[in-house]
């Protein structure tokens, strides 16, 4: 059952950076964690953040800084920054604290597992053949310079009575090599036959440990 581990969590603190950058004592930790979850759930539901690949939450002296990683920064910023200002105000009401919003543009969306998974899911919802969507995505990922890619879809594929899983793989995608920079994400497609799950693994090559000194620490450390 060694394959069941999440590649992101497995490498956090080794070659992957924390997505929550703050420290909380016993009294604060639970409150901060729940607040983080609420912030992420709120942002995922916002139309302006639909193209976002991830969110990084950082806390400092009563303030919260949220970094939105997206391939479409213009959509998040809005006309003359209107969308960002609205996000700040809504997050301030949600948390009761001052919130800063930063935008980090993803230069190569073809190498981001979350964006690739979401793209496949949206195609399946538009009734595009799941095999065609998978193969096209794999080709785009490899053309962008990835070392390897694996894509899996699960559910009532093509309306079949019995749910099953199918996957395609190209190149190398090691699961237990910590120095391998593996990006992983999952998405879901809502179809008339039910939910179709999509998982994507992208091998970006080997990477030296960037946080070896943080391994075993009790809480996230600001990078």
From Swiss-Prot:
CDD domains registered for this protein in UniProt: KH-II_30S_S3
Gene Ontology biological process terms, A to Z: translation
Protein origin, superkingdom: Bacteria
Single annotated GO MF: mRNA binding
Keywords attached to this entry: Ribonucleoprotein, Ribosomal protein, RNA-binding, rRNA-binding
Entry annotated with the keyword Ribonucleoprotein: yes
Disulfides per UniProt: none
Family to which this protein belongs: Belongs to the universal ribosomal protein uS3 family.
Subunit structure: Part of the 30S ribosomal subunit. Forms a tight complex with proteins S10 and S14.
Name recorded for this polypeptide: Small ribosomal subunit protein uS3
Gene: rpsC
């Amino acid at each position: 059952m060694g394959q069941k581990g999440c590649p992101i969590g497995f490498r956090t603190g080794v070659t992957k950076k924390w997505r929550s950058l703050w420290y909380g004592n016993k009294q604060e930790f639970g409150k901060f964690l729940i607040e983080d979850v609420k912030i992420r759930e709120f942002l995922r539901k916002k139309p302006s953040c639909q193209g976002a690949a991830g969110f990084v939450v950082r806390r400092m002296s009563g303030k919260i800084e949220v970094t939105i990683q997206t391939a479409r920064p213009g959509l998040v910023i809005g006309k003359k920054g209107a969308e960002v200002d609205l996000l700040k105000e809504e997050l301030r009401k949600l948390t009761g604290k001052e919130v800063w919003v930063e935008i980090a543009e993803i230069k190569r969306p073809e190498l981001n597992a979350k964006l690739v998974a979401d793209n496949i899911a949206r195609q399946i919802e538009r009734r595009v053949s799941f095999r065609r969507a998978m193969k096209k995505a794999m080709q785009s990922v490899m053309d962008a310079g990835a070392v390897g890619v694996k894509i899996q879809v699960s559910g009532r594929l093509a309306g079949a009575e019995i749910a099953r899983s199918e996957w395609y793989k190209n190149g190398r995608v090691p699961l237990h090599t910590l120095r391998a920079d593996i990006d992983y994400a999952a998405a879901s497609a809502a179809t008339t036959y039910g939910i179709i799950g999509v998982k994507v693994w992208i091998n970006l090559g080997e990477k030296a440990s960037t946080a070896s000194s943080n391994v075993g620490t009790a809480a996230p450390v600001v990078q």
